[in-house]
Design a protein with these regions (language model features):
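Short loop/turn segments that connect beta-strands within the blades of beta-propeller domains
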Residues: 56, 64-66, 75, 106-107, ...
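Repeated scaffold domains used in trafficking and secretory/extracellular systems
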Residues: 45-56, 91-107, 141-158, 196-212, ...
Length: 382
């Protein structure tokens, strides 16, 4: 996301389990263990389409367009502002739940960013939203004409913040750039500098995925318009391979056991074996584009069926590509709700800057979107 509060459409995934606490409505949900998470807390959530959703043993957190962090107890779907200050209106910098941009987790703390005169500032806070303090600052790029630039998009993964800077296209030799910031030490390094060609720009977090030590991102050539999908390695800081002719209608890729999984335009759901270089179409789809979310046990797909974006469909398949459920989406107002985050008991949907609906994962043959609990007049959390 460019330094503005627009959440991109992206890939996601999670496992088909229910928290046992849901069977006892009157009791407080049991705290989840590490086995309940699709990825470990702090790792990049490849199963989600939204960026700023955090799931830990303390509960679930997400950041809305209103710049308020919201929290739900483990197993619950009721989200509240992460602030326990009395009489707080939850709308300004004095609120514990308020932040400028981004939300991540690492080692018992939440992380976010604010924007000062000298560029983006990385902040650390306690899990209840209290005790905001500065960790460090991200670099600001200086153009040939002396102008300063700090716009870009960011992601969190395993103790690092990854910042994808916009290219400074006024420079004679411009290109995109990616910076890795350590959340513990405040130190950083530039990634893939030797491998990113000149006159290229990033497609942002919509096309980025991080799986273990692999960092996948899309590179667009600003001169020819051609796009490639880069397969980078975080240990070496180098791009190991690229997939050419990556259509704007393709999804981003997720990797498991050296196999890439993605939607390919005019083909369908595909697998690409990195060892052999062989691509296989596993589930043909006649749709304009699609964004799959891969979990351990199932695949959720939201397809855009027509070029005018006026028809969308939800699909659920098992990992052997057997169709479990399919349903056309309906607009709410002008827009279709989009899949945002997947937990053990819910597929959350996003509309107009917040989570508004969910699907209960206990029965994936029923893809009915249910409204989220109304917490507008309820207490805050902290």
């Amino acid at each position: 996301m460019k330094i503005k509060r627009i959440l991109s459409a992206t890939l996601a995934a999670a496992m088909l389990l229910c928290y046992c606490a849901l069977t006892a409505c009157a009791s407080k949900p049991a705290a989840p263990t590490a086995a309940d998470f699709e990825v470990q807390p702090g790792a990049y959530r490849y199963q989600d389409m939204g960026d700023f959703f955090v799931e830990t043993e303390q509960g679930q957190y997400y950041l809305g367009w209103d710049q308020i962090i919201r929290f739900a107890e483990p197993g619950s779907r009721s989200f509240y502002p992460l602030c326990n200050k009395p009489n707080c209106g939850h709308g300004g910098e004095n609120c514990n739940a308020y932040t400028d941009y981004a939300l991540g987790y690492w080692n018992g703390h939440l992380y976010t960013t604010t924007y000062g005169d000298n560029g983006p500032v990385v902040m650390r806070m306690d899990m209840d939203g209290a005790n905001h303090r500065e960790v460090g600052r991200l670099p600001v790029l200086t153009a040939v004409d002396g102008a300063r630039h700090g716009s870009g998009e960011l992601l969190f993964h395993n103790g690092s913040l990854f910042y994808m800077y916009d290219a400074i296209e006024t420079d004679p030799e411009w290109a995109m750039s990616i910076y890795q910031f350590d959340l513990e030490t405040g130190k950083g390094r530039w990634l893939f500098q030797e491998d990113i060609p000149l006159f290229t720009y990033s497609y942002g977090s919509s096309y980025v995925n991080i799986c273990g030590d692999d960092f996948f991102f899309k590179i667009a050539n600003g001169v020819t318009g051609e796009c490639t999908y880069a397969l980078g390695n975080l240990k070496t800081g180098r791009v190991e391979a690229t997939l050419p002719d990556w259509s704007n209608r393709n999804s981003r890729a997720m990797e498991q056991d050296s196999v890439l999984y993605y939607f390919k335009a005019d083909a369908g759901l595909c697998e690409y074996d990195r060892a052999t270089g062989v691509e296989t179409v596993r589930f043909p789809m006649d749709t304009y584009t699609a964004f799959p979310c891969y979990t351990r046990n199932y695949i959720l797909v939201r397809s855009t069926d027509t070029e005018d974006f006026e028809q969308c469909t939800l699909w659920v398949l098992d990992r052997d590509y057997n169709l479990l459920g399919k349903a056309p989406q309906e607009k709410i107002g002008r827009w279709f709700p989009q899949p945002y985050a997947i937990t053990a008991n819910s597929i959350y949907f996003w509309l107009n800057g917040k989570i508004t609906h969910y699907i209960d994962t206990s029965d994936l043959s029923n893809l009915e979107l249910l409204p989220m609990p109304d917490t507008s007049n309820a207490r805050a959390h902290g």
